[in-house]
Amino acid sequence: LVVSVTSRRVRFWDDFERDENFEEERPYLRNVKRACNDYKSSSYCRSVGSRNECGIHKYRMYCRKTCGSC
């Protein structure tokens, strides 16, 4: 009996090194991808900030500008 254990298959969209090179070649895309914006409404993000929930990863990503994550 032979058992083979392998890690998950690498997919072409998992090529992180290629992604980094792509970002370096086109700096205008880097600025667009990492823009400092709130992705939820301003009232939603204000309430997150007032409840001091910026430490929770989900809220920090939704309200990057309000929580000061960028």
UniProtKB/Swiss-Prot annotation:
Coiled coil segments of this chain: none
The keyword Cytoplasm is annotated on this UniProt entry: no
GO MF annotations, alphabetized: potassium channel regulator activity; toxin activity
Disulphide connectivity of cysteines: C36-C70, C45-C63, C54-C67
Region of interest (Crucial for binding to potassium channels), ranges: 58-59
InterPro entries: ShKT_dom
GO terms under cellular component: extracellular region; nematocyst
Protein family per UniProt: Belongs to the sea anemone type 1 potassium channel toxin family. Type 1b subfamily.
Protein name: U-actitoxin-Avd11a
Keywords from the UniProt entry: Disulfide bond, Ion channel impairing toxin, Nematocyst, Neurotoxin, Potassium channel impairing toxin, Secreted, Signal, Toxin, Voltage-gated potassium channel impairing toxin
General function of this protein: Inhibits voltage-gated potassium channels (Kv1/KCNA).
Compartments reported by the entry: Secreted; Nematocyst
Main location: secreted
Keyword Hydrolase belongs to the record: no
Residue ranges annotated for the ShKT domain, each copy included: 36-70
Superkingdom of origin organism: Eukaryota
